[in-house]
Amino acid sequence: MTPSAARTVERLVALDAARGATAALPAVRRALRDFPELSGDTTPPRGRDVDRVAALAELSEVVGWILFDAGLHRQAHRANARALTLTELCGDRWTQRLTLLNHSMLQTAEADPRGSLETAARVAGPRPLPARVDSLVLIRQAHASAVLGGRREARRLISRARSRFLDGLSRHDPHWAWWIDENELLGHEGWVLARLGDWDRALPLLHRAATAPGPSYRHLFGAELLAALARAGAWTEALDLIADLAPRAAAIGSARTTRTLAGAASGLRRGTRVPASLKDAAAHLLECLPAPAARSARPA
């Protein structure tokens, strides 16, 4: 059971990185069928086969992440709750922390920034966190603080996240810390600053993150860049970005990304000061997006 669960984790992570969360959904459904413990209908007894329960906890964490990025928030809540239950049973504090960090992001996406802050606070323990993990906590807190309107606090937190990131990796970091890299941090720095309307600083950071090579889920930074350009009134840059995004929009496998793109494009179409050429480009982008995202952005 443990090797099988571990192989499933590897397969799901690879699918998500290469093709996105929506492409990974069929494999998620198979995993839920193959491992009934993930559904919550059965609970492994405490203290029994700790390695097996830890593998199931990690699998449930990955499932929760994919469901979130695929836009299935209710199911993501369930998977995260299940992962947390399993980590309690096996004592896997690192998978528990990663699940809490994922859930904090989900809560911010659902306009629950106070809940996000409470969840992020649960990541701490009796010992100081490794730098990369602490950086992630600070990133989650910065996003939530920005949504709450705490401009000074959000800036302080995202600056502190950069400082902690620069402290580097250590032997105390969990195995999943590899994906917290420079481009991930750049994207979140830009995104937090865009939430605050600090376009002069946000746009270059988002552009660097959006144009860097990386896994599929980082298309989100390109979507956030378009949303920021639209809000900043940077029409020429928005037109250039749409020209780059539209040919590959149909293949984006993240519902978060396609919804953000659809929202930005829809706003550009309705804008009273938006040039006609940009409105046409925004309409074209909507046509290129997967149908559910395009439909959700169109006025009723």
Write out the residue ranges for each language-model feature.
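Conserved binding/catalytic microenvironments
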Residues: 2, 6-300
